[in-house]
């Protein structure tokens, strides 16, 4: 029975070394080209069986492994939790997975999340305990770990430290999550125990062991799943839409089942539903070359078989969305394939809110991941689309902001901002957040929301009437009325220009027209402890309805007093709280209503 390559997914926490580990196998340098050191798109690399046998020759006899699979196809799935959706897709597509864990740092939230995804997808996995070279005293060298793990090559203290870190940082956590696990060389029953393979992406130690374990497990337990479908049509997923010289727009895709031929029809999801177009060429990357950024040109193939990464050249691909499902079929099967693809596309619909922000991304998977992460921080999303940011979206966001300033935001993941949109943003009140790392965009969103909420709160507080108690100073009545001018001391709170003033018996006296400091300069407010001359315009007649040593209050309307008491109390100074408390007690007494302001 012919077997296809098992599809291998690599998951793990950010910076634990997923791409660097593959880098050691592929001999390329993908990691250094990725934004923020995080792999942002699902990539694919074929590792042929000859390469696996070559780097693992010392182990094949030791493990009595007879590998008959044609190789392995590695999907490099992003490791940060922001890419839950892409990882789910990667996990679901994968036959087996490598979970990368830093043996020195142990499990992180993203590690646990990755395990949960693998559980949901029922995908078997092996743990790569990376960075053994950083264990104090460890003598790490390229080649099999199992041949380096002995007292001849390692100091006893380093061996002890290795065992401690292996258990405390890896095995113990797996046990807590319900898995039996052990160092791969000690595993007796691979159906019940997780294999932990120590590796170093830096030196290459343990890479042969990892390849043998992955290949052997896939071949032993997934033989039926790996049986090549020699008659069925090809099924796959779009990774990226790319412009290629001499070819125009092309699709990079993973084919996970069936066979495709040049001249067949491509059925793929797009914004209008489904696109059907005739394939001009099927192009494959050279083995061990990374599809996202190949160093050499692709080679044409008349026929390809799963599992493989492929570049597809065909007409009318401009609007194809990355992450879309695809089928490659002969003409008589186009209608059936259209139904399948349409059904899958509909599953990608992102639910939107009646009000909220606009989010844009370069792929369906990224858009879904961005939306999911924003939902976790309680963001409301009015519009979510794949594609560049246009003037139309800026105008829409501006209209959203007119009803709620917190909605005047566009978040762009890995997309372009068109020229007319840039012009519109400059003259509008719309905020644009751009980035190539989703979790950082979410952090920026949270910072912006916090900043905006504080600004809006500050604006609202400033619009409210601030409470204050003042005392008319003796021998400081300078004018009796129209306006009355006298010296006052602020006992509690903040006295502002325009503040309405009332007496202790609740009579309206007027409002503060003017205040001056010791240098006779006009001021807008006076805080607790200040003694200032003020002019009060209104019904006040000094020495008649307001006298020396009288206590006067700033009159705060009940709705504003209630707001200050319930919503903004923490924003008030201690003396302002005291002024509000005394004022509310006075009003409750005057109005004969103990619930006044409550």
Swiss-Prot record:
It comes from the Archaea. Residues 200-202 are annotated as: G5. GO terms for cellular component: cytoplasm. GO terms for molecular function: GTP binding; GTPase activity; translation initiation factor activity. Keywords: GTP-binding, Initiation factor, Nucleotide-binding, Protein biosynthesis. Residues 76-79 are annotated as: G3. It holds the Pfam family GTP_EFTU_D4. Gene3D superfamilies: P-loop containing nucleotide triphosphate hydrolases (3.40.50.300), Translation factors (2.40.30.10), Translation initiation factor IF- 2, domain 3 (3.40.50.10050). Residues 130-133 are annotated as: G4. Residues 12-19 are annotated as: G1. Residues 3-225 form the tr-type G domain. PROSITE patterns: G_TR_2 (PS51722). Residues 37-41 are annotated as: G2. GTP binds at residues 12-19, 76-80, 130-133. Belongs to the TRAFAC class translation factor GTPase superfamily. Classic translation factor GTPase family. IF-2 subfamily. Function in general translation initiation by promoting the binding of the formylmethionine-tRNA to ribosomes. Seems to function along with eIF-2. This is Probable translation initiation factor IF-2. It comes from Methanococcus maripaludis (strain C7 / ATCC BAA-1331).
